[in-house]
Amino acid sequence: MRHKLLFSFFIFLIVALPIRSKDFVLTSGQTVVIACSPSEEQVVRTALEMLGRDIQTVLSSTTQTNEKTGEIVIGTVGQSELISRTGIDVSALKGKKQAFLLSVSPEGKLIVAGSDKHGTAYGILEISRLLGVSPWEWWADVTPEKKKLFKLSSKFQSLQAPSVEYRGIFINDEDWGLMPWSSRTYEPSKVKGEIGSRTNERIFELLLRLRANTYWPAMHECTLPFFLTKGNREAAKKY
């Protein structure tokens, strides 16, 4: 009888003790597995590539994409089963444009849910910001600090949505600045007045990191129009 009572007591302790939620932790040198559906839009895949580079820069870690599970789980609400499987409440994203939710699950996974494709992309690059990567890392030579460990509390949650619908950059007075730098230095071209696709892609990358969605390209008479420049249309589609 005494043994039965002790056994029952231990069972009670096991049942009564709460399950402790885990922090989200990445360590230097590990392979970071990211769960993301291959059906996600191109801008989401572009943001994933950028995050992969940022993780390599900050943690000296490689990334690997998996369709089912990972330390980071990414998806667009209503389009990705990965998000619905996590069981996290994404109702706060309903009716919002280009919004995202970052949340650490009880298992210690970082969940990134977007209300639409750009919301998901912005959420992915919020991880880069949390890692310490500035949106201006390339244009202003802001080298991020190396880390051995990156951790988010088990209670971490961040819901963000834009307060202004259209946010972007207008390229002005390119005659003496961007255009000659692009055509003579960054991507030398024999085409007069050309701001090449590599230059524009760097601008698009900055826009995505800044969560901008509008681009007014250079329009002075000395500059070749945006859509007449080879590769610009294809570059824009990635972002």
Where are the regions a protein language model picked out?
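Short, low-complexity interaction segments enriched in Ser/Thr/Pro/Gly
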Residues: 1, 17-19
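Bacterial N-terminal signal peptides that target proteins for export
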Residues: 1-7
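Aromatic-lined carbohydrate-binding surfaces of glycoside hydrolases
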Residues: 31, 37-40, 59, 66-69, ...
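Contiguous, structured surface segment used for ligand recognition
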Residues: 21-161
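Bacterial N-terminal signal peptides
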Residues: 7-16
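Short hydrophobic "helix-edge" motifs at membrane interfaces and signal-peptide entry regions
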Residues: 8, 105-108, 200-202
